[in-house]
A protein has these predicted regions:
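Thiamine diphosphate
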Residues: 1-122, 129
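Glycine-/acidic-rich phosphate or pyrophosphate-binding loops and their flanking alpha/beta elements
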Residues: 2-6, 220-243, 256
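Short, solvent-exposed amphipathic alpha-helical segments in soluble enzyme
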Residues: 35-37, 85-88, 146-151, 176-179, ...
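Glycine-rich beta-alpha junction loops
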Residues: 101-103, 163-170, 249-251
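Conserved thiamine diphosphate
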Residues: 110-164
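Conformationally flexible catalytic loops at phosphate/diphosphate-handling active centers
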Residues: 156-235
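Catalytic-core signal marking the mid-to-C-terminal active-site face
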Residues: 228-230, 267-268, 272-277
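Redox- and metal-dependent alpha/beta enzyme cores, enriched for Fe-S-associated oxidoreductases
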Residues: 238-267, 278-285
Length: 285
């Protein structure tokens, strides 16, 4: 199964009920798969008129309580950044897939890792963070998707799955047996109509400077909790390592092959593969 298709199926099994996207290579197979599977699963699929529209549809679905997802590739992710900043400021969960291609500019459709800084530093305006997960195989991709939705709901924060064109289009055996039914999170912020309760407001426009400062401190404390609790990484041949390589995603698979070859020459090399690019496993390194 291709990485893009496997990602789509994992999202359906993880309880995704809304998908909004706009075509761009090399993630088109995911959009095509969701166009078929979302109606079958009783969900909503909309091919939006633009990447900007797609991310704002995600915001609308999330504020109504849905598990919502969108996907794109590098130039399209640039267009989504304002909406991602709004999601972070509004504390709304969402899963955003970036199958990275070469850049800058329009670049090309070859796989790349050139969106790393954009994803891990908060690519839009304002000081915010997105949780960033970097799978290294199609099977791991299917395992990361449910985790992404759970982390998004748990922390009320957008989560980015950072893949690349190779991972999205390569074919590998996959199993979905370990995907559990989606967890149910209490979402007391969703806009469902004021049915015998005080009205709710989800907003990021804060004219009062003191109110905005307090809100940003609240976000900062949340980011600290994420850094304390959600660091994930893989250790590879570290027990006797004298040199350690750091690599993530598909690139880490290439590094593993190089390490095996170099160890035949008695070079003691190991690897740390960050699975969360943010929060980054800095203390381990």
């Amino acid at each position: 199964m291709s990485g893009n298709a496997a990602l789509g199926e994992a999202a359906v099994l993880a309880g995704c009920t809304c998908y909004f996207g706009y075509p761009i290579t090399p993630q088109n197979e995911l959009t095509e798969y969701m166009a078929k599977r979302m109606p079958e699963a009783g969900g909503i699929f909309i091919q939006s008129e633009s990447e900007i529209a797609a991310i704002n549809m995600v915001l609308g679905a999330s504020v109504a309580g849905a598990r919502a997802m969108t996907s794109s590739s590098s130039p399209g992710m640039s267009l989504k950044q304002e909406g991602i900043s709004y999601l972070a400021a509004d504390e709304l969960p969402a899963v955003i897939v970036d199958m990275v291609r070469g850049g800058p500019g329009m670049g090309n459709i070859s796989p790349a890792q050139s969106d790393y800084m954009q994803a891990t530093r908060g690519g839009g305006h304002g000081d915010y963070k997105t949780i960033v997960l970097a799978p290294g195989s199609v099977q791991e991709l299917t395992e990361i998707v449910p985790l992404a939705f759970d982390l998004a709901d748990q922390y009320r924060n957008p989560v980015i799955i950072l893949g690349d064109g190779m991972l999205g289009q390569m074919m590998e055996p996959v199993s979905f047996d370990d995907i559990k039914p989606p967890k149910v999170y209490q979402k007391d912020y969703v806009l469902t109509g004021a049915l015998g309760r005080p009205s709710r407001m989800v907003r990021s426009l804060l004219f009062d400077t003191k109110e905005e400062e307090e809100h940003n401190w609240k976000l900062f404390r949340k980011y600290q909790r994420i850094e304390q609790n959600e660091v994930r990484y893989e250790s590879y041949m570290l027990d006797d390592a004298e040199m350690v390589a750091i690599a993530y995603g598909i690139g880490a698979r290439i590094v593993k092959g190089a390490i095996k070859r170099l160890r035949q020459d008695n070079l003691k090399i190991g690897m740390i593969r960050p699975i969360t690019l943010w929060p980054f496993p800095s203390k381990v390194i």
